[in-house]
């Protein structure tokens, strides 16, 4: 199906069909079936996009990459089953004054910012549990207070670790019958809930990277600098993990959107289920809510950009 102007409300698209190429044609971005006989599959106005996510055997034409750089469009690369591989961040997104201020942060200011993020993460974890009818979480409230009174980043990481352990020990209580969660596992995730959590954290990280395009993504305030790791995006994402990522996963399974039989033996989503996931994730990011501080309606996607500012 070819797209029309009204098919999307936001600025992010997902290309999952294997054997396709993303091209540019007369001020529009075109997804073309190069291995089959589908021809033009979709088309979007260039000026309305700022992020394109591609999965597996999807490639970009050289003229399109130049166009993406000119228009400030971020390109994120994933394997076919959603494992993040890398990103192209255009030079146009760099603003010298913003980065100069970022580089000038001293250790005390960095700690204050990091502590605020982790306190927000713990508060949001408690909020999610409360919304799902899970109570007896005063220990999280206490840890949230402790997070704002630490003296070092190592102390803050210790508080975060304690809060995470307490929070995940109660997450199972938010799930409907037929789903269980014992502990957080990664690389590889050992069950279906952990698989969905890992996938959602990757998708959310790339949303945050788009919001932080004017900054140096590799210079964070909490996560240690490591070659190739977008530490600043991981920092900003922390506060949103429970209330956006974990809430999205519980919604998927509790509403029956995703079921156990849609996973492969290695706990990855099947191709059809993955397409469903991408669509639901984008819908979720476009949903609006009343911002707790600004008190006006904003989409989840735009809330990242406000937080980045």
Short names for language-model regions:
Residues 1-27, 32-35, 43, 95-309:
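Active-site helix-to-loop segments that bind/position phosphate- or nucleotide-bearing substrates
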Residues 48-127:
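A surface-exposed, charged beta-strand/loop segment in the N-terminal or early-internal portion
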